[in-house]
Amino acid sequence: IRNMVATIEHKHGPIDLFCSNAGFVTSAGLEDANERIQKMWEVHVMAHIYAARAVLPQMIANGGGYLLNTASAAGLLTQIGSLSYSITKSAAVSLAEWISITHYHQGIRVSVLCPQAVRTDILTNSPDNREGDPEWEDGGVASSDGIIEPTDVAEVCMEAISEERFMILPHRQVQGYTEFKAENPEKWLSGMRKFQDRLFIDEPLPGDLMQDFR
């Protein structure tokens, strides 16, 4: 990332806006391999850190700049059936908050993008790709409020950046979910358990797949 940033700055000049967008999803819980959890940590968290390290010094020297970091609604609400995705996207949101707090006075502005399902190749490219599974191909748990197009997400992002708005929620329902979670965590957890039961009505629940690690 550092070399890429240096090349772009050399060829085109200072970077005003850096969009940090990479990710993949897996379906596993505590039984997932350490190596897979670590890989997701590298992609969903450390990649944002590497990017910030690469672009912030020059942005600050130039009087400011903008980071658009893609996280996920899972970072605010959790992802049923995927431990690694849930915890790394939560960390990505926290990282964006930290950068905004720490570097705001230096002219750095941050937005964190937290969509649900978007029509991309993230599921097709997943190491757990279940091609032929209708539920998987329809977007899985994240598609409960519909799948939106990348162009729609881009429009929402441009509007948010023009307003210097931190939290970008292309699926408007997520705002209500996060408010309900903050107001009543116990009811929210109960509702998520019931949602999980509905999702896996004819198959084992994710927790039933955990092996004995002792």
For the regions a protein language model found, what residue spans apply to each?
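Conserved amphipathic alpha-helix within the SDR
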Residues: 1-13
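Conserved mid-core segment of classical short-chain dehydrogenase/reductases
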Residues: 2, 24-38, 81-84
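Conserved hydrophobic beta-strands of the Rossmann-like cofactor-binding core
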Residues: 18-19, 67
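Active-site helix of classical SDR
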Residues: 52, 88
